[in-house]
């Protein structure tokens, strides 16, 4: 393996910027690039992050806002989407003890620093410790951001080195390598829950089973959810699993997903019932689309079966073929789904607004303008929180008012006793009096 250590004074390579103020061009001088071949191996960051020569002063990053304002220190690495290289790992030698790495807005990992050396800060005339920390990314990327964390909310961070491990971008990157859920460590989550003495709810266990199946088969979890929630998403999954053609891809991309067409809980209930009923139909009663989909691999049938089982626990057993499923029982299930598929929702445009389903006649409890299910649940939760807050404040005010009346009554009784003919003379200690009343916590 050939490894080349190059300085930052190159025409090509990633750019290094910061959210805090730094001298013009000073931060770029701290950037060191490490390039390897396509089959890259791990580097020795312990050696690469060794303290520089005494003549090379660290770069000082300072916050332009007051300490009361929340303004974390970020440094940004960007190779450009059209560049020929991608980032494998990063290392930083700075006064910040820890660092967090993000791929866009997605958290990637945290690295805790080790003490490397001590430098003298000319502005403060004091010695400052520098810590070396590095992190290998789960998947190569062309851009990332690093959050530098210091204890005590310091408004100045010294950066001595930023080492970036690069390799040539692969010609045929796998689009499924960064699928949602691939970075979720389910075993670690289970261990943490057991150590806390907590148990997952049935809905959370079903969701973890779905994510585990997605990780084992390397399928995007969004496609699984679409397969559960509607026929349009189910057809989209079938098109992805079969051999792609331009016509199929165009049709799949233009097919409106259920979450993008403004579903209500009632519409989701109907889609779920249709999916369960579909499995009970005889093989000869299907339409032509079902015959065309018969050539799929067995794992597709396993996927459909597992997803049906994951949903069936949330649906009550049907007493007759004409019975309806109340949408209120799907609320916990929808709350879990909304948190997982929120990434699928983007801003509405005119094309999606045209596809919003109109309210059906005879349906009770459906608003005239059907809104996306996530917005629907958000309004319900927000209203319930406001009502809960109002009830709590009213209860507190009532208890304070009752306590004030009780104190006033006792004070008036005490004044009457002191003014009475049988009151003790001044200077004599008062006799202990027990009203036999108890406080709410049982004390007297």
Swiss-Prot record:
Would you name any one GO CC term?
A: mitochondrion
Show the Pfam families listed in the entry: PAAT-like (PF14958)
Is the Hydrolase keyword given for this protein? Answer: yes
Record's catalysed reaction(s)? ATP + H2O = ADP + phosphate + H(+)
Could you tell me where the Polar residues compositional bias lies? Answer: 280-289
Please state the protein's primary subcellular location: cytoplasm
Task: Tell me where in or outside the cell this protein is found.
Answer: Cytoplasm; Mitochondrion
What organism is the protein native to?
Mus musculus (Mouse)
Organism's domain of life?
Eukaryota
The name under which this protein is listed is: ATPase PAAT
Quote the PANTHER family the UniProt record gives: ATPASE PAAT, C10ORF188 FAMILY MEMBER
| Known EC number | 3.6.1.-
């Amino acid at each position: 393996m050939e490894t080349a250590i190059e300085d930052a004074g190159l025409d090509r390579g990633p750019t290094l910027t910061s959210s805090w103020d730094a001298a013009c061009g000073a931060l770029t001088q701290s950037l060191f690039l490490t390039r390897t071949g396509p089959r890259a191996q791990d580097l020795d960051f312990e050696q690469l992050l060794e303290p520089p020569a005494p003549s090379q002063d660290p770069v000082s990053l300072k916050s332009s806002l007051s300490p009361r304002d929340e303004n974390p220190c970020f440094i940004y690495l960007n190779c450009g989407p059209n560049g020929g290289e991608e980032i494998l790992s990063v290392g930083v030698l700075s006064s910040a003890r820890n660092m967090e790495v993000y791929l866009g807005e997605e958290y990637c990992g945290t690295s805790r620093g080790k003490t490397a050396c001590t430098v003298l800060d000319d502005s403060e005339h004091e010695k400052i410790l520098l810590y070396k920390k590095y992190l290998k990314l789960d998947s190569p990327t062309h851009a990332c951001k690093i959050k530098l964390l210091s204890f005590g909310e310091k408004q100045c961070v010294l950066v001595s080195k930023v080492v970036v491990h690069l390799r040539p971008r692969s010609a045929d990157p796998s689009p499924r390598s960064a699928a949602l859920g691939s970075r979720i460590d389910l075993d670690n989550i289970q261990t943490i829950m057991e150590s806390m003495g907590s148990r997952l709810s049935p809905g959370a266990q079903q969701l973890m089973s779905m994510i585990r199946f997605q990780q084992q088969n390397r399928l995007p979890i969004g496609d699984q959810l679409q397969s559960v929630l509607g026929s349009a998403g189910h057809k989209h999954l079938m098109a992805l699993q079969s051999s792609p053609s331009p016509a199929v891809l165009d049709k799949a991309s233009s097919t409106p997903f259920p979450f993008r067409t403004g579903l209500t809980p009632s519409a989701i209930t109907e889609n779920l019932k249709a999916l369960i009923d579909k499995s009970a139909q005889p093989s000869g009663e299907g339409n032509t689309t079902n015959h065309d989909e018969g050539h799929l691999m067995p794992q597709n049938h396993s996927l459909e079966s597992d997803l049906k089982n994951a949903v069936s626990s949330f649906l009550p057993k049907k007493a007759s073929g004409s019975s309806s499923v109340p949408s209120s029982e799907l609320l916990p299930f929808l709350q879990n789904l909304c948190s997982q598929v929120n990434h699928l929702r983007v801003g509405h445009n005119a094309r999606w607004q045209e596809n919003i389903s109109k309210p059906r006649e005879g349906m009770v409890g459906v608003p005239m303008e059907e809104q996306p299910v996530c917005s629907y649940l958000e309004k319900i939760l927000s209203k319930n929180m406001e009502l809960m807050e109002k009830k709590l404040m009213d209860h507190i005010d009532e208890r304070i008012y009752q306590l004030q009346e009780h104190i006033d009554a006792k004070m008036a009784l005490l004044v009457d006793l002191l003014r009475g003919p049988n009151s003790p003379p001044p200077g004599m200690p008062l006799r202990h009096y027990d009203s036999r009343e108890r406080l709410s916590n049982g004390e007297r």
